[in-house]
């Protein structure tokens, strides 16, 4: 050992402390992994190059960073004893004086002195207890080992030996710190780069050029590449401070093909030539003693069954990776894998590997952390594993050569267990079908003369497709024709089903007149008896009774009360010395506006239109007119508030949990907030609902499970908050506001600090610090997600009798749009379409949707709109505007997958008019084809560009007419022409068709077809 050896004291004491803490905690545990050992022996003899990484030297690397041959460690609960030579002892001297004492016993060449030190260690072991932890599987050898065994053998019968290997795995090697993870990540990136940037190129070149090379020779090429520092320095994923001198082989490289495969780590490359078919490559690299391993299967001209089996293996691999998260029992990973194989291809169950990986770190394979169906160890964040899925000796009947009709497959990745899932360190070497498939044989197939004509046609079609997709705006609309055909067929079935459901639903019913629900006449009474009149009426003056909402007017010497609901307005005017008060009353036929829809009990009765009173008291009449106006405003406001509160149902009482403390989620904010300051409160789960408790004034909000329609949990991935959202069946009041959505959230971000000049930053600037910061951010977010998800599941469990279930948005199929005023991300869930991040929230229940319509779907536009029509036709359709056209196919696929019928068209429609038509006669609407008129608009798009333009103009004029009848419009001239248009509609339609036919004929004569015109116009 050279003088350059420097042991990291900080790392040594941190790791030694964690080891002792785990040992002491284990003594209090009911599930002991240390086996009750009072002392622990770690014996290291000569360095064994053939079997260089076992538990004994792994503990050396873990604690010291180096291997110290001919050294004995004896751990007791109070002291760590080290027996070694004087040369090695000087490197250990700085470790004295720590929190845990380290006593160094120096041996010499004097055999008696060495025996005396060993006897001292034996006495220490005996005094520590009758159980001693050893490593029975380690096969260390050498004179030092023999001398120790001779002395130790005298007491070996007096003490009970326990295997300490599982304890070392759990306490030392399983959960890695930041430095260890950085080393494993760098080793993994070196593996990925060597596999994807070197081996794949070499392999494909050999096969393409049909050169012969043995597996062993190719392995030696890869072996030599590890000394090429320039190669590793050029790898983009490796950090700038990566030291190529610190890497070494941990395993392999091993190349296999041609029907002979061995998926064990003991496999070696044989002398057979590399052959096409199934090629398996695997190797492992160490960086600063920490291992990473990678394995890939490459398919060269594969058969259909081989492709299918590899796709199955990909699915299994992905499923196992998803299970590799904090808190999962190790055996669940294997059970998940074998369950998928058993469900999808039971005939391959016997060919599946017996485990799906093992722990990896200093040891290439930790035998105590094998991921099989029996391991009950719990995975923790920070653990690292080599995940391996494989199929062994699968027969391929289509291959005639009996020596090659058997193949194996394998995928191996090095991963880190995270809070919510794994971090795949070797992901840069692709495993998808496109990355591992190679096709060389197809190029040699001769073209048959009989198919020459057909081939020419295909080439023409292909070139035309290239021409059509040369514009970027068109590319998102290119879809798989087979999938599009299946989707179109499914939509036809859904449309027919909707029409049939509509006919069955509205059979024998009549709609609302003019598509508007008729208001009922409401009786109102100012006073039931004469003695209830105010005393001031004796003065025979105009009196405004605010309490009774009545205006009392003297008529013929008698006070006559008029309820404010009969009064339209009041005005005061001056003429000479007199002031005039005019009171206008509501009566039939006064107006045709939408607001003039006051119902009357008997339209044939006589109605008083207005009263005019005269007085010289100008100020008095001004005050009366003002009082009547205010009274009318207050009455209208009360009516509006009453209307808004019609659907607010008073909830039952919340049944609180009394016999124990309720489950709580602390430090959460409420939306919509309670009145006052924005402060965090807590959510409690009670017997029949939730209660949000504010820290101020003992305010609270109760939500009953019986009123919960949807319960959502949205994690904080790509968001600033993590939230639980409750969508209610009927709205409730929070303060003075009515709401149907209640949200509990917590912010996921922290205050960031600039560490410039900080001593810590000065010494840790670079990749390690960045990695640590990322780790901390992920850890904090993952902890938030875990806490909120667990609480949401507890809510669902408490409300399961009311059908409460947790729904999580699918961000990967979400799309941006404008449901209100701002552009937000809208995400589907299992039962709804939601936007929960920004208020106002959007929650659309899928089972309430009648049909969806895509508007403004036409060439040249960068976005489109989406309209949802509900089964309750009195409910206004919901619009989501300005969705990027890139999401068009994704939106269609999602709508089709959840069985929502959809149509599309090039224009925005007047949905107020459409829904009035539907509501006025729903049965007649469905009898005439229902929503098929929307689909007809979509079908017309398949015609030429000329047809699209004429349809556009026709629809625009119709729309303008509809809109002008509904509300003020800039196109009044078009609206006024609507009657004239309807008189000769059929005739003008024929004229346009005839003109269009003539125009097409002339274009054909000039050699210009529709497609050419379309392209010209596009330029």
Swiss-Prot record:
<dbReference type="Pfam" id="PF00557">
    <property type="entry name" value="Peptidase_M24"/>
</dbReference>
<dbReference type="InterPro" id="IPR040258">
    <property type="entry name" value="Spt16"/>
</dbReference>
<dbReference type="InterPro" id="IPR011993">
    <property type="entry name" value="PH-like_dom_sf"/>
</dbReference>
<keyword id="KW-0804">Transcription</keyword>
<keyword id="KW-0539">Nucleus</keyword>
<comment type="similarity">
    <text>Belongs to the peptidase M24 family. SPT16 subfamily.</text>
</comment>
<dbReference type="GO" id="GO:0006261">
    <property type="term" value="P:DNA-templated DNA replication"/>
</dbReference>
<keyword id="KW-0158">Chromosome</keyword>
<feature type="coiled-coil region">
    <location>
        <begin position="625"/>
        <end position="651"/>
    </location>
</feature>
<dbReference type="GO" id="GO:0006368">
    <property type="term" value="P:transcription elongation by RNA polymerase II"/>
</dbReference>
<feature type="region of interest" description="Disordered">
    <location>
        <begin position="443"/>
        <end position="498"/>
    </location>
</feature>
<feature type="coiled-coil region">
    <location>
        <begin position="775"/>
        <end position="798"/>
    </location>
</feature>
<dbReference type="GO" id="GO:0031491">
    <property type="term" value="F:nucleosome binding"/>
</dbReference>
<feature type="compositionally biased region" description="Polar residues">
    <location>
        <begin position="458"/>
        <end position="468"/>
    </location>
</feature>
<dbReference type="GO" id="GO:0007063">
    <property type="term" value="P:regulation of sister chromatid cohesion"/>
</dbReference>
<dbReference type="Pfam" id="PF21091">
    <property type="entry name" value="SPT16_C"/>
</dbReference>
<feature type="compositionally biased region" description="Basic and acidic residues">
    <location>
        <begin position="483"/>
        <end position="498"/>
    </location>
</feature>
<dbReference type="GO" id="GO:0140719">
    <property type="term" value="P:constitutive heterochromatin formation"/>
</dbReference>
<comment type="subunit">
    <text>Forms a stable heterodimer with pob3. The spt16-pob3 dimer weakly associates with multiple molecules of nhp6 to form the FACT complex.</text>
</comment>
<dbReference type="InterPro" id="IPR029148">
    <property type="entry name" value="FACT-SPT16_Nlobe"/>
</dbReference>
<dbReference type="Pfam" id="PF08644">
    <property type="entry name" value="SPT16"/>
</dbReference>
<keyword id="KW-0227">DNA damage</keyword>
<dbReference type="Pfam" id="PF08512">
    <property type="entry name" value="Rttp106-like_middle"/>
</dbReference>
<dbReference type="InterPro" id="IPR056595">
    <property type="entry name" value="Fact-SPT16_PH"/>
</dbReference>
<comment type="function">
    <text>Component of the FACT complex, a general chromatin factor that acts to reorganize nucleosomes. The FACT complex is involved in multiple processes that require DNA as a template such as mRNA elongation, DNA replication and DNA repair. During transcription elongation the FACT complex acts as a histone chaperone that both destabilizes and restores nucleosomal structure.</text>
</comment>
<feature type="coiled-coil region">
    <location>
        <begin position="477"/>
        <end position="501"/>
    </location>
</feature>
<dbReference type="InterPro" id="IPR013719">
    <property type="entry name" value="RTT106/SPT16-like_middle_dom"/>
</dbReference>
<feature type="region of interest" description="Disordered">
    <location>
        <begin position="936"/>
        <end position="1019"/>
    </location>
</feature>
<dbReference type="InterPro" id="IPR013953">
    <property type="entry name" value="FACT_SPT16_M"/>
</dbReference>
<dbReference type="GO" id="GO:0006334">
    <property type="term" value="P:nucleosome assembly"/>
</dbReference>
<dbReference type="GO" id="GO:0035101">
    <property type="term" value="C:FACT complex"/>
</dbReference>
<dbReference type="GO" id="GO:0006281">
    <property type="term" value="P:DNA repair"/>
</dbReference>
<keyword id="KW-0234">DNA repair</keyword>
<dbReference type="InterPro" id="IPR048969">
    <property type="entry name" value="FACT_SPT16_C"/>
</dbReference>
<dbReference type="GO" id="GO:0140713">
    <property type="term" value="F:histone chaperone activity"/>
</dbReference>
<feature type="region of interest" description="Disordered">
    <location>
        <begin position="755"/>
        <end position="774"/>
    </location>
</feature>
<feature type="compositionally biased region" description="Acidic residues">
    <location>
        <begin position="938"/>
        <end position="994"/>
    </location>
</feature>
<dbReference type="Pfam" id="PF24824">
    <property type="entry name" value="PH_SPT16"/>
</dbReference>
<dbReference type="Pfam" id="PF14826">
    <property type="entry name" value="FACT-Spt16_Nlob"/>
</dbReference>
<feature type="compositionally biased region" description="Basic and acidic residues">
    <location>
        <begin position="995"/>
        <end position="1007"/>
    </location>
</feature>
<protein>
    <recommendedName>
        <fullName>FACT complex subunit spt16</fullName>
    </recommendedName>
</protein>
<dbReference type="InterPro" id="IPR029149">
    <property type="entry name" value="Creatin/AminoP/Spt16_N"/>
</dbReference>
């Amino acid at each position: 050992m050279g003088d350059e050896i420097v042991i990291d004291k900080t790392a040594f004491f941190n790791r030694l402390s964690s080891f002792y803490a785990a040992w002491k905690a284990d003594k209090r545990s009911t599930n002991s992994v240390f086996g009750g050992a009072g002392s622990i022996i770690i014996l290291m003899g000569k360095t064994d190059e053939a079997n260089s990484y076992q538990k004994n030297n792994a503990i050396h690397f873990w604690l010291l960073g180096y291997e110290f041959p001919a050294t004995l460690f004896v751990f007791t609960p109070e002291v760590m004893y080290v027996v070694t030579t004087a040369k090695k002892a000087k490197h250990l001297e700085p470790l004295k004086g720590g929190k845990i004492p380290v006593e160094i016993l120096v041996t010499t060449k004097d055999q008696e002195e060495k025996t005396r030190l060993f006897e001292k260690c034996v006495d220490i072991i005996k005094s520590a207890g009758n159980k001693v932890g050893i490593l029975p599987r380690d096969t260390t050898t050498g004179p030092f080992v023999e001398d120790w065994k001779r002395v130790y053998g005298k007491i070996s019968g007096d003490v009970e030996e326990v295997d300490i290997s599982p304890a070392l795995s759990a306490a030392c090697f399983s959960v890695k710190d930041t430095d260890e993870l950085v080393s494993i990540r760098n080793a993994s990136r070196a593996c990925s780069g060597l596999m994807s940037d070197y081996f794949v190129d070499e392999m494909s070149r050999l096969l393409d050029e049909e050169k012969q090379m043995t597996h062993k020779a190719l392995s030696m090429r890869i072996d030599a590449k590890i000394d090429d520092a320039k190669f590793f320095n050029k790898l983009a994923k490796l950090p700038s401070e990566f030291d190529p001198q610190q890497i070494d082989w941990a395993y392999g490289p091993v190349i296999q093909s041609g029907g002979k495969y061995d998926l064990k780590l003991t496999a070696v490359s044989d002398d057979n030539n590399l052959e096409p078919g199934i090629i398996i490559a695997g190797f492992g690299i160490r960086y600063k003693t920490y291992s990473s391993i990678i394995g890939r299967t490459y398919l060269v001209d594969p058969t259909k069954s081989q492709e299918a089996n590899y796709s199955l293996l990909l699915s299994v691999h992905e499923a196992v990776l998803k299970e590799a998260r904090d808190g999962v029992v190790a055996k669940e990973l294997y059970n998940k894998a074998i369950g998928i194989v058993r469900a999808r291809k039971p005939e391959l169950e016997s060919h599946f590997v017996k485990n799906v990986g093992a722990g990896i770190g200093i040891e290439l394979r930790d035998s105590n952390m094998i991921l099989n169906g029996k391991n009950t160890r719990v995975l923790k964040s920070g653990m690292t594993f080599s995940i391996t899925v494989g199929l062994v000796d699968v027969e391929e009947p289509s291959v005639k050569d009996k020596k090659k009709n058997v193949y194996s497959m394998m995928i191996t990745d090095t991963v880190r267990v995270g809070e919510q899932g794994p971090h795949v360190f070797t992901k840069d070497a692709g495993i998808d079908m496109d990355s591992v498939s190679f096709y060389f044989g197809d190029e040699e197939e001769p073209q048959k003369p009989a198919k020459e004509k057909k081939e020419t046609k295909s080439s023409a079609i292909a070139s035309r497709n290239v021409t059509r997709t040369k514009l970027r705006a068109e590319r998102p609309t290119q879809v798989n024709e087979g999938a599009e055909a299946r989707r179109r067929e499914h939509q036809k079935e859904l449309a027919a089903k909707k029409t049939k459901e509509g006919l069955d639903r509205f059979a024998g019913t009549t709609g609302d007149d003019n598509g508007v629900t008729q208001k009922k006449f409401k009786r109102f009474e100012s006073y039931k008896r004469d003695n209830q009149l105010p005393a001031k009426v004796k003065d025979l003056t105009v009196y405004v009774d605010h309490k009774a909402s009545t205006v009392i007017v003297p008529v013929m010497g008698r006070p006559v009360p008029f309820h404010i609901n009969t009064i339209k307005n009041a005005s005061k005017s001056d003429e000479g010395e007199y002031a005039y008060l005019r009171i206008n009353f509501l009566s039939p036929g006064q107006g045709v506006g939408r607001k003039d829809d006051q119902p009357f009990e008997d339209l044939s009765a006589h109605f008083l239109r207005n009263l005019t009173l005269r007085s010289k008291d100008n100020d008095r009449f001004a005050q009366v007119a003002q009082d009547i106006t205010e009274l009318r405003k207050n009455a209208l406001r009360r009516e509006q508030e009453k209307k808004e509160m019609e659907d607010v149902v008073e909830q039952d009482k919340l049944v609180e949990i009394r016999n124990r403390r309720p489950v709580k989620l602390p430090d959460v904010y409420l939306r919509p907030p309670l009145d006052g300051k924005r402060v965090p409160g807590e959510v409690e789960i009670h017997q029949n609902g939730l209660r949000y408790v504010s820290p101020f004034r003992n305010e609270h909000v109760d939500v009953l499970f019986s009123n919960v329609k949807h319960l959502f949990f949205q994690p904080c991935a790509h968001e600033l908050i993590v939230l639980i959202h409750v969508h209610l069946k009927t709205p409730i009041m929070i303060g003075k506001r009515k709401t149907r959505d209640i949200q509990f959230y917590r912010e996921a971000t922290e205050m960031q600090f600039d560490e410039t000049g900080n001593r810590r930053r000065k010494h840790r600037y670079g990749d390690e610090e960045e990695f640590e910061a990322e780790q901390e951010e992920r850890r904090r977010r993952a902890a938030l997600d875990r806490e909120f998800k667990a609480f949401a599941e507890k809510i669902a469990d408490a409300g399961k009798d009311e059908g409460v279930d947790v729904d999580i948005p699918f961000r990967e199929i979400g799309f941006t749009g404008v449901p209100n005023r701002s552009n937000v991300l809208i995400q589907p869930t299992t039962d709804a379409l939601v936007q929960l991040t920004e208020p106002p929230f959007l929650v659309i229940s899928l089972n309430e949707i009648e049909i969806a319509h895509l508007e403004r779907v036409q060439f040249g536009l960068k976005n489109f709109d989406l309209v949802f029509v509900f089964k309750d036709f009195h409910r206004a359709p919901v619009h989501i505007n300005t969705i990027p056209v890139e999401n068009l196919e994704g939106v269609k696929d999602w709508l089709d997958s959840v069985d929502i019928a959809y149509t599309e068209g090039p224009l925005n429609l007047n949905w107020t008019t459409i829904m009035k038509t539907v509501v006025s006669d729903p049965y007649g609407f469905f009898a005439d084809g229902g929503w098929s008129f929307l689909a007809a608009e979509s079908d017309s798009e398949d015609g030429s560009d000329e047809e699209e333009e004429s349809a556009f103009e026709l629809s625009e004029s119709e729309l303008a007419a509809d809109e002008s009848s509904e509300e003020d419009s800039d196109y009044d001239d078009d609206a006024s022409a609507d009657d004239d248009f309807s008189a000769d509609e059929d005739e003008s339609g024929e004229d346009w068709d005839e003109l269009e036919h003539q125009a097409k004929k002339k274009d054909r004569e000039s050699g210009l077809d529709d497609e050419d015109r379309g392209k010209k116009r596009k330029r």
